[in-house]
Amino acid sequence: MASTEYPPMKGGIGRYTYNLVKALRNLGLDVYVACNEAGKGDFSGLSPTNKQNSEVLLKIVEEINPDIVHIQFEPGMYGSILDPINRRNSRTYIDSFYFKCKTPIVTTFHSGYNFGEWMSQSFLIKKAGRLGIFGVPLRFAVKFFSHLLTYNTFKNLNKQKLDQSHSGVVFSNYMLKSIGEGCRIIYHGAEPYSQTISGKKEARSILSLPQDSKLALAIGFRTVSKGWDLLKKMNIPHGWKVVVNSSAGHYSTEKYDMNFITSRSNNIIDLQRDFLEERDFSLLLYACDATLLPYRITSSSGVMFDALSHGIPFIASDLAFFKEFAELGLGITVKRNRTAFSDGIKEIERNYSYYSQNVDKFKEKLKWNFVASEYRSVYSSIKKPRS
């Protein structure tokens, strides 16, 4: 199992990999983890900055001779170069591993954008810089044309990995359309941490959260793509409070000031507890009634799956990924503005039992033993190494 992120490193992909490995081992599979030096895997050496990632993995494969190599893939995790001028120069530091490895490869894809969402990233422009706000038009122009020229390159990096894998896995139909029809959909695993609490009241008591309000949770990494700015504009409905907890990813260099969130409203509770371990993360989800996902862009959301696994419906931006799960009655999508999100909270409250019942049925598909069994089925379907 290869992932540059792995606990105790902070990161959603690392958390996903850890839980999947644990579940696969519970099924009796021998799983060895290759990751970064900061992670507690069985082998190390992988890094977004290591140009020798392929050689590191090839050496590990030669040493342990596995039946399957399972790659948790997101281009930036292994180092990616997107050349807008010469596409042949675009690559990741894991490309040659895919070409040279004779052991069957299974690849789980963690990102895959359609053209509209890929281009929308060019609108996420920082206001600071050498020219300050006056440099925004220039920064936008550079970023816009860079994204325009690199979209097909980004898609090709994923497509190449799929073509060179025995099997590809994605988390949704949206990602299936983006990555390729040769993939299999296995929902992102998520499950409450094993702990004994009597319910929402006790969870709130442990976390010192109010008992007399409904709570909507906004949690994730401090990045502009998460849409945190919307929180300061929202008119939070009567009887509700918004609980916020943000953190910085292990590899993140983005600086995002969250101080503005609590300056406007006493209906926003900023926990400021950084990246939560499994127990506390689960406890926080138990304490809340809904999750807010005002994302500007996304191709997947581990937070959404985690919330669903705790029986919590969502209110999300009207992005294609979220729409897919809203159509299953697991939450709602709205226009990304303060009025729509406020109305979305009210809609969830009015029909809470409907959404809650749908979520309770769906979350069985997210349990890690179920997800691991699906992967075992993928592994078992692979008959022989590549020639």
Kindly label every feature range from the protein language model.
Residues 92-100, 124-167:
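Membrane-proximal helix-turn-helix segments that form the acceptor-binding/catalytic region
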Residues 190, 219, 241-257, 274:
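Glycosyltransferase donor-sugar binding loop
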Residues 195-209:
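A short helix/loop element that forms part of the nucleotide-sugar donor recognition site in Leloir-type
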Residues 210-226, 232-236, 243:
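Conserved donor-binding/catalytic core segment of Leloir-type glycosyltransferases
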Residues 246, 255-282:
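Nucleotide-activated donor-binding/catalytic signature segment of Leloir-type glycosyltransferases, i.e.
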Residues 290, 313-316:
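Short hydrophobic beta-strand element within catalytic cores of glycosyltransferases
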Residues 328-339, 345-352:
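Conserved acidic donor-binding segment of nucleotide-sugar-dependent glycosyltransferases
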Residues 352-381:
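A charged, aromatic-enriched C-terminal amphipathic alpha-helix characteristic of glycosyltransferases
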